[in-house]
């Protein structure tokens, strides 16, 4: 068992009508439809992805 830090992310707005790169980032986070949640490893790369689409997601 490792003690890796995690972050829980929820998609709260639709990526329709956003930039293609932002839609790809949402998919990269593993989020598909509004309300979907993922628990991800808390790394600088994941934090950067969350920051890029912060207007679409919510950190729980």
UniProtKB/Swiss-Prot annotation:
UniProt keyword terms in alphabetical order: Ribonucleoprotein, Ribosomal protein
SUPFAM superfamilies registered for this protein in UniProt: Ribosomal protein L30p/L7e
Gene3D superfamilies, sorted: Ribosomal protein L30, ferredoxin-like fold domain (3.30.1390.20)
GO cellular component, as recorded: cytosolic large ribosomal subunit
Spans traversing the lipid bilayer: none
Entries under InterPro entries matching the protein: Ribo_uL30_ferredoxin-like_sf, Ribosomal_uL30_bac-type, Ribosomal_uL30_CS, Ribosomal_uL30_ferredoxin-like
Family the entry assigns: Belongs to the universal ribosomal protein uL30 family.
Name of protein: Large ribosomal subunit protein uL30
Organism of derivation: Methylibium petroleiphilum (strain ATCC BAA-1232 / LMG 22953 / PM1)
